[in-house]
Amino acid sequence: MALEEELDEERVEEAKRMWNGVPLSFDQEKMIKWYTEERGGARGGADVFYLMFGITYNCQLKCPHCCVGNYENEPPRELTTDEIKDVLDQSAKAFVINFFGGEPTLRQDLMELIKYASERSIYVFVDSNGIKITKDYAKQLKDNGLEMLYVSIDSPHPEEHDRLRGMKGLFDIATQGIKIALEAGLRCELSTYVTKETLANGDFEKVIQLARDLRATGVRYTLPTPTGRWLNNPEVMLTREEERKLRKIAKFPFVCRDFYFQNQSSSQCAGMSGHAYFYISPYGDVMPCCFIPLTFGNIREEPLKTIIERMWGHHMFSEDWVNKECPMLNKGFRERYIHTIPGGTKLPFRMC
């Protein structure tokens, strides 16, 4: 039976208009089906489109640009399998659950969590450094319902990628992992970040070409942002001229920016402007984004829906920067909400 025959015709047409030109990481038919069901009230739980779910801070590497590198790391406090499943049940309206780290593949229950989410018609993504992606592991990911694997590639040059991540031979391991994932039938994108240097010397374009050579699904990129281990380094940010150059290089939909509405008529952050995205830490802290070290509650203490409503109702989300770029790129936002956090405070900082 055709999709249009299964679902309300008016809502299908609305969904097609809204999601015209989605990133290659999304299956458009599944997105339309999700949108019509969610708008039609067929799903229950908290309102969310994309949940970035940190399930561990543990990682084999220690990258200087890690966006969660300055968060408190106490493995015994990590959410249990049952606690994560409870959050997934509370997130039944979600289109995407993106398991994030640290390195998610270090959790022994990852396959169980992927299966649990996919059985609830949630689209499951996983971010990885690629170290554990063997043929057997990729098959398990596929068999349990993983839809998209993001593998980090920081540089097109093997020795530079290895240096940045502190592990010799990692580039070859990661690119081999990408090939294995694709052969297993998984969608697999290269995940990278842009810097002033890689934009100027052409390395970002070479990462895109590497993705094409590997026949990857696409490239997801992040702008250099003063967060994580870069929290006190605003000089990493691109200038407006550099951003214009980047937009000319990053040809959508093969190349897309993370966590942004991608209809190309807008560059608004999906979290701050659309309330469509948020982050949960491995310890249950609910945050607007993994880049923003502020928490509005913990799922061990309150229902997810209650925390989300409190978070999006906070006055910071009605202020000037909301309909603009990532707030962590905004000097006024950082000065008002980040630089006022008392020194020595463990992050993320509790807002209420």
Locate the predicted segments by residue:
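Flexible mid-to-C-terminal extensions adjoining Fe-S/redox cofactors in radical SAM and related proteins
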Residues: 2-19, 24, 30, 34-35, ...
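Short, intrinsically disordered, charge-biased short linear motifs at domain edges
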Residues: 44, 48-54, 253-258, 274, ...
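Conserved, mostly hydrophobic/aromatic
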Residues: 59, 63, 284, 304
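A short acidic, helix-capping loop that chelates divalent metal ions and anchors anionic groups
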Residues: 72-74, 157-164, 227-233
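Radical SAM/AdoMet-radical enzyme domain recognition
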Residues: 81-100, 107-222
